[in-house]
Regions:
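Acidic, surface-exposed loops and disordered segments
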Residues: 1-238
Length: 238
């Protein structure tokens, strides 16, 4: 076989004698004593909530970088590591993007040029509602968003961005940052405004994966909720 840069040799060596690709055991975090308790991790999973109300405040650059650094450890198919992560990390830029999206949606609706797409009825009205009263149905007044794309020739082109955002979200919520999986922004960019993608740093070589809003929440959840379990089938093979 050939090396795909996943570094299990570095991670497994009991004496820390392996160095590879410029990394040594001294650069790494020991696992013993540093893994969270299962109950704590379970509470984080259960306490994760979608946030649709945000403070108008930039997330500090240092904290944002910590979230991005943690999410970089999300697995990718064949360890390809070809993700492209676009972050709108300033409220002023987010406001400009928000305004541009709604103005274009309103223009498409007014001229009858709205493409036939998923959530078309929503997009037909979104620009008008924004102009009339500032209703922000797509961005939920979030101060930031992160948009993840993957190389079109990646082994797991659709799966990798979703795994990345799952890592990003859990670390964000562990640090008091609210998040929202934003399907409306994803569908808008994919189906209605694909010409926005280059300005968001996504070239033709990459496929849009998904989008997530984030920022300091203006509400605080106090407890977990009760949810219905997934349908589980235990399979025997005789």
């Amino acid at each position: 076989g050939h090396c795909i840069r996943c570094q299990p040799c570095l991670a497994v060596c009991p004496r820390g004698a392996v160095s590879i690709m410029g990394a040594a055991a001294s650069d790494c975090t020991p696992l013993a004593g540093n893994i969270p308790e299962p109950r704590q991790l379970d509470t984080l999973f259960k306490g994760r909530r979608s946030v649709r109300h945000y403070k108008r405040e930039n997330v500090s650059p240092g904290l944002l970088q910590e979230l991005l650094d943690s999410a970089a450890y999300a697995p990718t198919g064949s360890n390809a590591q070809n993700l492209l992560v676009s972050v709108v990390d300033d409220i002023a830029a987010m406001d400009a993007l928000r305004e541009a999206v709604y103005l274009r949606l309103d223009e498409l609706a007014e001229t009858g040029a709205m493409p036939d797409c998923q959530r078309r009825a929503f997009f037909l009205s979104a620009g008008k509602l924004w102009k009339a009263g500032g209703w922000d149905g797509i961005f939920r007044s979030a101060p930031h968003c992160v948009i993840v794309a993957n190389a079109k020739n990646a082994t797991c082109v659709e799966q990798d961005p979703l795994i990345y955002l799952s890592y990003f979200e859990l670390m964000a919520q562990a640090r008091g940052i609210g998040t929202l999986w934003c399907g409306l922004l994803y569908w808008c960019l994919r189906d209605v405004l694909p010409d926005f993608l280059p300005r968001l740093g996504i070239p033709d070589t990459h496929q849009l994966g998904y989008a997530m809003l984030f920022g300091y929440p203006s509400i605080n959840y106090r407890r977990t909720v009760e949810t219905r379990s997934a349908l589980v089938r235990h399979i025997g093979w005789n």
